[in-house]
Amino acid sequence: MKLRKSLGQHMLVDRRVISRIVGYAELSEDDVVLEVGCGTGNLTSALLRKCSVVGIEKDPLMVKRLRERFSDFIGKGRFRLIQGDALKVDFPYFTKFVANIPYKISSPLTFKLLKTDFRLAVVMYQREFAERLCGEDNRLGVISKTYCKAEILEIVKPSSFNPPPKVESAIVRIVPEPEVFVENRELFEKFVTFAFSMRRKRMGKIVQEFRKRYGVELAVNKNLAEKRPEELGARKFAEIVVGE
């Protein structure tokens, strides 16, 4: 089957990697897995051996192939396939999220996931995105800490995919347990986004500029005032916002 680069299609074909992903998800028969970007169904097949699966696939050619390949599971109600854009369709009920997602939608899809109710997610990302998600020296990593705990489980080589991507990938486990609590999430995310848009400036100056732009007075102590955004981490950002 000819794959479409416009959809970022890189099919996971390494059975050992697929097996480890399923293992990381710690699935039971009672689980319902949501898989975004089912592709040709290699991961889907392994998931269906463990539990029920709901898949979301945008490519109509892939949808046709999936319906043919898993017609028995569909007939038994073990596999439900939704054709559509995962960023636009409402997520159905699920307990765990397991997917090799299209890398081009990593950020919006991850935040959509984090705002839903789930027990555990095991996601294949581009390595660079995974490192930002699990780090604290960037906007994505800082904000994500207020939603979840995320850790890289392993790095996956391009040869595990068809066609091979130009970059390495990473399997990430996400547990919906916030590492940092923030009461005013809207203000926190606005301030973090603003700060990292001015990452070369020090926090004292950034707080001043934020006040001028939005009329919000934030408190920053002398020590933090001399630091740049990538030096703070989620907890220090939260301390600044709490002091507003």
Swiss-Prot record:
Protein name: Probable ribosomal RNA small subunit methyltransferase A
CDD domains assigned to the protein according to its UniProt record, in alphabetical order: AdoMet_MTases
Predominant cellular place of this UniProt entry's protein: cytoplasm
Protein origin, superkingdom: Archaea
UniProt keyword list: Cytoplasm, Methyltransferase, RNA-binding, rRNA processing, S-adenosyl-L-methionine, Transferase
Function: Specifically dimethylates two adjacent adenosines in the loop of a conserved hairpin near the 3'-end of 16S rRNA in the 30S particle. May play a critical role in biogenesis of 30S subunits.
GO molecular function: RNA binding; rRNA (adenine-N6,N6-)-dimethyltransferase activity
Subcellular location as annotated: Cytoplasm
PROSITE patterns found in the cross-reference section: RRNA_A_DIMETH, SAM_RNA_A_N6_MT
SUPFAM superfamilies per UniProt: S-adenosyl-L-methionine-dependent methyltransferases (SSF53335)
Chain residues that bind S-adenosyl-L-methionine: 10, 12, 37, 57, 85, 100
